[in-house]
């Protein structure tokens, strides 16, 4: 059965999206991403040498033939994000964009007001916008209404590896959304990625948990397998949760004859 994910003009077989930060080397990053099976990777514009011919990150990403999703990490408001997006489109030749606006450098919480403002402007400018946001069901609907191709609510703070601390809100967002929901930030273990997929998320984005693992290549593969398992479980429909016990084996009536 085909179970591809379609976002705007692209179709993906893998539902694991990945980041490129924090890896020790470009080569290590490449092998981890390859092992994960990821087809879409996000990269911060500030990490790319636009004028350079041999940028390390881009060299390895092009070798893997990944789809690039530039992000506006570092932008503090809508104006800066739109400027960064324009540079990214010119430098990388893609209108796809992960919109990130977080003015607080300590906790990196996304600014909902500036994000909505920037999203509306960028969609009108022809960008395929995937906004990183709080797990706010109302905000997600507003972003959907202005034309975002997907929404990317956080599971917990960026790089925290705390997992799905926003689970209750993620469930509401997934239930109400008419665009793909990609759980982004805070996923620290393959089991947490599987959990997000079991909830019905269209995809997850993972970076830190892979990049700082003891064996990044093995962890990449583990995340790829976990996402597949979680998606399969969701499609198979999980058994209902019950407070009562239910025997898995039938009662044996012959015992009554003893």
Curated annotation (Swiss-Prot):
Compartments where located: Cytoplasm
GO biological process: thiamine diphosphate biosynthetic process
Family of the protein in this entry: Belongs to the ThiG family.
The UniProt record lists the keyword Aminoacyl-tRNA synthetase: no
Domain of life: Bacteria
Tagged with keyword Repeat: no
Alphabetized SUPFAM superfamilies for the sequence: ThiG-like
MF GO annotations: thiazole synthase activity
InterPro entries: Aldolase_TIM (IPR013785), Thiazole_synthase_ThiG (IPR033983), ThiG (IPR008867)
Catalytic activity: [ThiS sulfur-carrier protein]-C-terminal-Gly-aminoethanethioate + 2-iminoacetate + 1-deoxy-D-xylulose 5-phosphate = [ThiS sulfur-carrier protein]-C-terminal Gly-Gly + 2-[(2R,5Z)-2-carboxy-4-methylthiazol-5(2H)-ylidene]ethyl phosphate + 2 H2O + H(+)
The protein's name: Thiazole synthase
GO CC annotation: cytoplasm
């Amino acid at each position: 059965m085909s179970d591809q994910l379609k976002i705007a003009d692209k179709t993906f077989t893998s539902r694991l999206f990945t980041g490129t930060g924090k890896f020790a080397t470009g080569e290590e990053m490449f092998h981890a991403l390859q092992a994960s099976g990821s087809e879409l990777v996000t990269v911060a514009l500030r990490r790319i040498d636009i004028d350079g011919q041999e940028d390390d990150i881009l060299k390895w990403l092009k070798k893997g033939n990944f789809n690039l999703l530039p992000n506006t990490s570092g932008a503090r408001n809508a104006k800066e994000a739109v400027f960064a997006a324009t540079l990214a489109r010119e430098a990388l030749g893609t209108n796809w964009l992960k919109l990130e606006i977080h003015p607080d450098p300590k906790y990196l919480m996304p600014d909902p007001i500036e994000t909505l403002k920037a999203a509306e402007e960028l969609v009108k400018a022809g960008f395929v916008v995937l906004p990183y946001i709080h797990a706010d069901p109302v905000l997600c609907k507003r972003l959907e209404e202005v034309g975002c191709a997907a929404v990317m609510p956080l599971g917990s703070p960026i790089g925290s590896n705390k997992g799905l601390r926003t689970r209750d809100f993620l469930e509401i967002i997934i239930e109400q959304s008419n665009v793909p929901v990609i759980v982004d930030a805070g996923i620290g273990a393959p089991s947490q990625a599987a959990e997000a997929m079991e909830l019905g998320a269209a995809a997850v984005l993972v970076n830190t948990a892979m990049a700082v693992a003891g064996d990044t290549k093995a962890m990449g593969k583990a995340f790829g397998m976990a996402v597949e398992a979680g998606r399969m479980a969701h499609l198979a429909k999980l058994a209902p949760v019950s407070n009562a016990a239910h025997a898995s084996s039938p009662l044996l009536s012959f015992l009554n004859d003893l």
